[in-house]
Amino acid sequence: MGKPTGFMEIKREKPAERDPLTRLKDWKEYSAPFSEEASKRQGARCMDCGTPFCQIGADINGFTSGCPIYNLIPEWNDLVYRGRWKEALERLLKTNNFPEFTGRVCPAPCEGSCTLAISDPAVSIKNIERTIIDKGFENGWIQPRIPKKRTGKKVAIVGSGPAGLASADQLNQAGHSVTVFERADRAGGLLTYGIPNMKLEKGIVERRIKLLTQEGIDFVTNTEIGVDITADELKEQFDAVILCTGAQKQRDLLIEGRDSKGVHYAMDYLTLATKSYLDSNFKDKQFIDAKGKDVIVIGGGDTGADCVATALRQKAKSVHQFGKHPKLPPARTNDNMWPEQPHVFTLEYAYEEAEAKFGRDPREYSIQTTKMVADKNGKLKELHTIQMEKVKNEHGKYEFRELPGTEKVWPAQLVFIAIGFEGTEQPLLKQFGVNSVNNKISAAYGDYQTNIDGVFAAGDARRGQSLIVWAINEGREVAREVDRYLMGSSVLP
């Protein structure tokens, strides 16, 4: 604790963000890291708690509290305050393989459980983390770590998202020969095609993939298991296989008019936009274009917000985002106490941009889409909705009830369905013969072994839709279990 009175004297700061209207003109990152001095000030606010709840990584009432990868947050906060940046980087990398990702797109459950947040704004942990790793790359402190010895064991990893990359990194450092298979044309999975460039610039992902390649990991893209290579071939060629395919099966909205032209899954929209941007700066026209259209995003989460931001950059005529839940309160309520994840109203980057563009927040709350209507050519022209009320039933459980008389018709030529994911796609599960429940691969947490010998599973493919930090956590842990399976014991943390 470098400055015992820091939390009393220094206010929380946000990193600089580009003007919303200016950033709508391009696809570059909307935010910037802290300056060195700002990071030191914010590090001084850390109280070095005896029990640092910021790093507990616990599940409280179904939500994540604290960091799931157990980042040594008070330690590197203090080192940053003291200007010992390289040591701060070393402490950060002990637990987090990819701080350049989490420092940008993680929802920061660490801050929600920060002890200071009981009475004051939390320490700016996420932005300090980003500044540490960015400074590490800028100063050349991060160089390829090529293993000095190889074990002679080979591991195949299916999927190159955060769980796959974390397990690959760990196993490679343990001396195993690792090959990562990715069905897309670029490695990175969700990091590459699931998150827009203005939120996570793809050069940052490519830099990490290049580093992992230099360290000895092989990436095989444009390769789908069951099409280009069979599961049996993988099991024959490798000593162990890890399934890290993510939860790619998108949840559908099966209502009247769903088959209208202009209704798309959110991830299809985001993926095509990013791919076209990377391939040709949109010159190939191989994307879903919202220009001049009334756009409605169904689903109130982060993926929906990314659709809003993408549509704004494409110069949509109007954008609305529908969510079934009521608007969150401005501060914690008595049934949402610290250190639970705070369920409070926030204004994310996409909503700031919509307010700047249209003068209003695009979110509509407690609303249910009842049907979609197409014109005589089958093209979507409008959505019908009704307001909902969230109430407790006689059993004490919440349920949603329609409010008669609140029906409304919305003009719409594009709709993006962003209501979550159901789990792993079935063809892959059948290829390997692994057991599953509700499209999630059956493999116990902490063990990660499926019912098929030598086949493991981790990340969203196992646990369902979750956070990037949980994917990294499971990638690291499954690597340890695979190392133990191959060698009898493990050198990995």
Curated annotation (Swiss-Prot):
Induction: The gltAB operon is positively regulated by GltC and negatively regulated by TnrA under nitrogen-limited conditions. It catalyses: 2 L-glutamate + NADP(+) = L-glutamine + 2-oxoglutarate + NADPH + H(+). The keyword Amino-acid biosynthesis applies. GO terms for molecular function: glutamate synthase (NADPH) activity; iron-sulfur cluster binding; oxidoreductase activity, acting on the CH-NH2 group of donors, NAD or NADP as acceptor. NADP(+) binds at residues 299-313. Gene3D superfamilies: Alpha-helical ferredoxin, FAD/NAD(P)-binding domain. It is an enzyme of class 1 (oxidoreductase). Signal peptide: none annotated. InterPro entries: DPD_II (IPR028261), FAD/NAD-bd_sf (IPR036188), FAD/NAD-binding_dom (IPR023753), Glut_synth_ssu1 (IPR006005), Glutamate_Synthase (IPR051394), Helical_ferredxn (IPR009051). Its EC number is 1.4.1.13. GO terms for biological process: L-glutamate biosynthetic process. Pathway: Amino-acid biosynthesis; L-glutamate biosynthesis via GLT pathway; L-glutamate from 2-oxoglutarate and L-glutamine (NADP(+) route): step 1/1; Energy metabolism; nitrogen metabolism. Keywords: Amino-acid biosynthesis, Glutamate biosynthesis, NADP, Oxidoreductase. It comes from the Bacteria. Belongs to the glutamate synthase family. Aggregate of 4 catalytic active heterodimers, consisting of a large and a small subunit. This is Glutamate synthase [NADPH] small chain. The lineage of its organism: Bacteria, Bacillati, Bacillota, Bacilli, Bacillales. The gene is gltB.
